[in-house]
């Protein structure tokens, strides 16, 4: 019994170093020395003792050191022929049997704890490195996707608004372009019409100008022709006190003829008064005047007729100068006269000129007939 208790005592401390690696080796070596110094243990073979100590967690060096300290390294177990060593051989085995369940249990618990700790640490590392990023990444991805979806919806709304605005602006621009094109076409039509009207007006104006030029030239010619012929003079009026009283006599027709011949134009009178040759060649007319006035007043009648003719000639010259000035003013104003006025003036001048010429011709012819009749009588 004592040997079994001694065997259990070193087995308990030897189990502790196997379970705890932190405990120093000196106590284990001391317990192993005590275990080897036991008399019963000495009887067991060396290999069994070494195997037992190895089971307790000692290394080969520690086992050798324990054998050296115990002094049993050189001891040999007794021979196999003796019957006494059989029991001690079985005693270490019997001593080891009660110690194995406790140590193995603690060893299993420690190993299980270590394995669980390693598994937990591995799971923690896996969760930290792989699972957590996946979980957090999925959430962040979802948040980012939600943000992107909201931003895309906002962008789509803004794009739709901009598209509608662009469409409205394009429609307004197209309407403006259409209006501008219509205005341009209207302006082009107006320009074409204006060009056509201006061309026609230019042609008409050129024609009117040519007509006016031709009419002005004709007017100038007519005015020049009028200057060549004197204007129609008014019949000279004799005062009533100078008109002699007619006496019934056979020479009345001659007097009538001579009275009709007194209506000769002042041009003829002027020509007769200015040319003494004509006076010398027409003594018959002077005698006719003398017969009109009577034999008693011959000298006074001749004097009065000459003065009257001179006055009439002077008046006609003044009238002619006034008319020439008026004609010059009319020639200056002819360029400003309208077409109708020019035509009317032209027609009136033509009519007046022709009538005056005819009247002058008739009046010039009358005294010749009267003189012929007086010569016949």
Curated annotation (Swiss-Prot):
Where does the protein end up?
A: Peroxisome membrane
Statement: the UniProt record of this protein carries the keyword Lipid metabolism = no
Task: Tell me the residues on which Phosphoserine occurs.
Answer: 232, 282, 335
Question: Which key words are in the record?
Answer: Acetylation, Membrane, Peroxisome, Phosphoprotein, Protein transport, Translocation, Transmembrane, Transmembrane helix, Transport
Q: Which GO terms describe its cellular component?
A: peroxisomal importomer complex; peroxisomal membrane; peroxisome
Task: Spell out where the chain crosses the membrane.
Answer: 109-126
UniProt lists compositionally biased (Low complexity) regions at 1-20, 244-259, 265-275
Span list, region Disordered: 1-23, 230-377
Which loops or segments lie on the Cytoplasmic side of the membrane, by the record? 127-377
Tell me any Pfam family this protein matches: Pex14_N
**Coiled-coil residue spans:** none
| Residue ranges, compositional bias (Acidic residues) | 323-342
Q: Which residues carry this modification: N6-acetyllysine?
A: 34
Q: Which residues lie on this side of the membrane: Peroxisomal?
A: 2-108
Output compositional bias ranges, type Basic and acidic residues: 360-377
Which GO annotations describe the biological process of this protein?
Answer: negative regulation of DNA-binding transcription factor activity; negative regulation of DNA-templated transcription; protein import into peroxisome matrix; protein import into peroxisome matrix, docking
User: What domain of life is recorded for the organism?
Assistant: Eukaryota
What is the annotated quaternary arrangement, including any partners?
Interacts with PEX13; forming the PEX13-PEX14 docking complex. Interacts with PEX5 (via WxxxF/Y motifs). Interacts with PEX19. Interacts with tubulin.
Which PANTHER family has this protein been placed in?
A: PEROXISOMAL MEMBRANE PROTEIN PEX14 (PTHR23058:SF0)
Q: What does this protein do?
A: Component of the PEX13-PEX14 docking complex, a translocon channel that specifically mediates the import of peroxisomal cargo proteins bound to PEX5 receptor. The PEX13-PEX14 docking complex forms a large import pore which can be opened to a diameter of about 9 nm. Mechanistically, PEX5 receptor along with cargo proteins associates with the PEX14 subunit of the PEX13-PEX14 docking complex in the cytosol, leading to the insertion of the receptor into the organelle membrane with the concomitant translocation of the cargo into the peroxisome matrix.
Regarding protein family, the annotation reads: Belongs to the peroxin-14 family.
UniProt-recorded name of the protein: Peroxisomal membrane protein PEX14
Q: Which gene encodes it?
A: PEX14
């Amino acid at each position: 019994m004592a040997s079994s208790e001694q065997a259990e005592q070193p087995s308990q401390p030897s189990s502790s170093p196997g379970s705890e690696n932190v405990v120093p080796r000196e106590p284990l070596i001391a317990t192993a020395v005590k275990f080897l110094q036991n008399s019963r243990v000495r009887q067991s073979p060396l290999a069994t003792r070494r195997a037992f100590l190895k089971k307790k967690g000692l290394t080969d060096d520690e086992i050798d050191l324990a054998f050296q300290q115990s002094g049993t390294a050189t001891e040999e177990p007794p021979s196999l022929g003796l019957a006494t060593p059989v029991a001690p051989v079985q005693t270490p085995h019997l001593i080891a049997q009660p110690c194995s369940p406790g140590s193995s249990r603690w060893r299993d618990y420690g190993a299980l704890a270590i394995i669980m700790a390693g598994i937990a640490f591995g799971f923690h590392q896996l969760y930290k490195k792989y699972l957590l990023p996946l979980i957090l990444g999925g959430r962040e991805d979802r948040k980012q996707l939600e943000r992107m979806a909201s931003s895309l919806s906002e962008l789509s709304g803004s794009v739709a608004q901009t598209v509608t605005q662009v469409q409205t602006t394009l429609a307004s621009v197209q309407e403006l372009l259409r209006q501008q094109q219509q205005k341009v076409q209207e302006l082009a039509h107006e320009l074409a019409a204006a060009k056509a009207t201006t061309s026609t007006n230019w042609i008409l104006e050129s024609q009117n100008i040519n007509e006016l030029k031709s009419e002005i030239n004709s007017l100038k010619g007519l005015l020049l022709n009028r200057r060549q012929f004197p204007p129609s003079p008014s019949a000279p009026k004799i005062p009533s006190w100078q008109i002699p009283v007619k006496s019934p006599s056979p020479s009345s027709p001659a007097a009538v003829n001579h009275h009709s011949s007194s209506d000769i134009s002042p041009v003829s009178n002027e020509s007769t008064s200015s040319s003494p040759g004509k006076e010398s060649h027409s003594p018959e007319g002077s005698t006719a005047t003398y017969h009109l006035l009577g034999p008693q007043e011959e000298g006074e009648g001749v004097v009065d007729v000459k003065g009257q003719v001179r006055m009439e000639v002077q008046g006609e010259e003044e009238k002619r100068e006034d008319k020439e000035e008026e004609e010059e003013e009319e020639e200056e104003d002819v360029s400003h006269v309208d077409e109708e006025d020019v035509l009317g003036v032209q027609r009136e001048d033509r009519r007046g000129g022709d009538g005056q010429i005819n009247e002058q011709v008739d009046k010039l012819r009358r005294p010749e007939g009267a003189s012929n009749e007086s010569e016949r009588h």
